[in-house]
Regions:
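Non-catalytic C-terminal accessory modules of carbohydrate-active enzymes
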Residues: 394-523
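Carbohydrate-active enzyme catalytic cores, enriched for enzymes
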Residues: 288, 292-448, 507
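Short, solvent-exposed helix-helix connector turns and helix-capping sites enriched
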Residues: 50-51, 84, 146, 360, ...
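Short, ordered beta-strand-loop transition motifs
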Residues: 99-102, 106-109, 119, 189, ...
Length: 523
């Protein structure tokens, strides 16, 4: 047994020698509440000055821990899609899946260059630091048992820490559209340590931690590196929360994850509380009384719903649901009904502003999750079961007067004629100058799809592409001399769909009678 252990440790040492060696980070013991139940042995060994043994005891504690749960992954039923398996295998060769818009994925070199920027699209650089291939590598490891995935993950994790140091910069520079005069190490911080990306890692690393924890490559030294780095992430967000919008929501929800998943940190209660307080506040700041999210973008409206729901999920799993009041749930339900109303019969959404197109598969999955939260809502149940259970709303057309979304339909079925119009108030960054735009569904097809988001931001040609696709004249609305709308502050003055329908039907009936035509000839 001793010989086998020595061989394993030697193999790991040979592996890490190709990159940065793992180090024992003794400062981790000052970050943890060593009086937390289960850490008694860790505390005793640390007080005796035996930090290496304390780190081993800490790893034993985490491997045996069962009182903390996350709804994101079921370790008893780990599955991996063909696409995820490809990301995992490509990741071994440093070909990293970063962005669906840039395929095939780029290779970042044998000695990973975390600053490689092959196309000057900011998202390509930002999303590299979300490490989307890490969780698939963890799934591949758990399913196959092949240690190569765990070894490579540990190597890349340490490599990222060493090559992406956090240096101080002005908070507002994280959100600049173009890097301007910011260069070198500070420019890299702008991408690697933007709070949104940091929060993404906070959330995803809870799953990665669980997936790789049994591996011999997950050494006591690595554990201390991991925990110190994780702590640094949470502290960074706490000091650099975004001012508003979906970024703030994402960051808050993920701080709840951090505080709930690692309650052993001294600051964990403060992390969790900060996230809960922000979501409880922002759900009323960012969501209008009609259920519309104030960025007026269907994609980010959907994202906001799922952010609020994920917070409830981690709360339910760990026993703190009571920290979210009833009006929090009521607002989520109104947001879901808003989204259901503006969606088309095939479950897709209008691509207003920076929206992206959803798929039916994705949306049925969402409705199923939402139906568990709101089992009494028959409409949500209807969409979750594709009409097998539940019931459709008892109306056709619907106006969301504050958000400025208006839906006209004669049916909820695939044969419907449905028009969705956007004419809302002033919104935020993702809202394009597209007031008056519409999409028209007829008999199973979207005849007037809007352009949605082509690209967000970047340098040179990328920014030119962004600006071209944002133009008012590119949307399904009116303009003058191809100029952009200078303001998007529409106000609803009148919404009487039923009265209008009655008036139109009355005129049609009178005309039919005068011309002696059967009134049932048309509907």
């Amino acid at each position: 047994n001793k010989t086998l252990k020595y061989i394993i440790l030697l193999a790991i040492a040979c592996f890490v020698s190709k990159g940065y060696a793992q180090e024992l980070k003794s400062e981790v013991f000052s970050l943890l509440n060593l009086d937390y139940p289960g850490l008694e042995k860790v505390k005793a060994l640390h007080q005796e000055g035996k930090d290496e043994d304390a780190a081993k005891a800490l790893l034993d504690y985490y491997r045996a821990r069962t009182n903390v749960k996350t709804p994101d992954i079921n370790l008893n039923k780990v599955t991996i899609s063909k696409e995820e398996q490809q990301w995992a295998d490509d990741g071994l060769k440093h070909t990293f899946f970063v962005h669906k818009g840039y395929q095939p994925s780029y290779n970042y070199g044998e000695d990973i260059n975390w600053q490689y920027w092959p196309v000057k699209d900011n998202e390509l650089r930002w999303q590299l630091h979300r490490h989307k291939w890490f969780t698939p590598m963890g799934k591949a490891y758990r399913i196959s048992g092949d240690e190569k995935y765990a070894k490579e993950w540990a190597h890349q994790y340490i490599d990222w820490i060493k090559k992406n140091p956090l240096v101080k910069m002005d908070k507002k520079e994280y959100e600049l559209v173009s890097d301007g005069k910011i260069k070198g190490e500070v420019e890299n911080v702008r991408f690697a340590w933007r709070p949104l990306e940091v929060s993404n890692r906070l959330q995803d690393q809870t799953s990665q931690f669980q997936l790789f924890l049994p591996s011999p490559s997950f050494t006591p030294d690595f554990l201390t590196e991991f925990l110190v780095n994780y702590y640094k992430h949470a502290v960074h967000i706490l000091a650099n929360y975004s001012d508003q919008g979906n970024h703030l929501l994402f960051e808050a929800q993920r701080m709840i994850y951090a505080g709930a998943f690692f309650p052993e940190f001294k600051d964990a209660p403060a992390w969790r509380k900060s996230g809960i307080d922000i979501l409880n506040r922002e759900i009323h700041v960012q969501v209008y009384e009609d259920g519309g999210q104030f960025e007026l973008d269907p994609h980010y409206h959907l994202a906001a719903i799922n952010i609020f729901c994920k917070a409830l999920g981690i709360a339910d799993a760990n026993g703190f649901r009571k920290e979210f009041p009833q009006d929090y749930l009521d607002t989520i339900e109104s947001m879901i009904m808003f989204y259901a109303n503006i969606s088309f019969p095939d479950y897709t959404n209008p691509c207003f502003s920076d929206a992206k197109l959803t798929t039916k598969k994705e949306m049925v999955k969402n409705y199923k999750a939402w139906s568990k939260l709101f089992p009494k809502n028959q409409a949500i149940k209807y969409f979750a079961t594709e009409g097998k259970e539940g019931a459709l709303p008892d109306y056709m057309s619907k106006g969301f007067l504050k958000s400025g979304f208006f839906v006209f339909r004669n049916s909820w079925g695939m044969d419907a004629t449905q028009m969705v119009v956007k004419a809302g108030p002033k919104a935020f960054w993702h809202c394009q100058p597209d007031n008056g735009t519409f999409e028209l569904w007829f008999n199973g097809k979207n005849l007037f799809p809007d352009s949605g988001s082509y690209v967000y931001a970047g340098e040179g040609e990328v920014m030119e592409q962004r600006n071209w696709h944002r133009q008012t004249c590119v949307h399904n609305t009116v303009t003058l001399d191809n100029k952009n709308l200078e303001t998007t502050e529409s106000v609803t003055k009148l919404w009487q769909p039923w009265q209008v329908a009655v008036k139109v039907l009355s005129i049609f009936t009178i005309r039919c009678r005068k011309e002696k035509l059967p009134t049932a000839a048309k509907t």
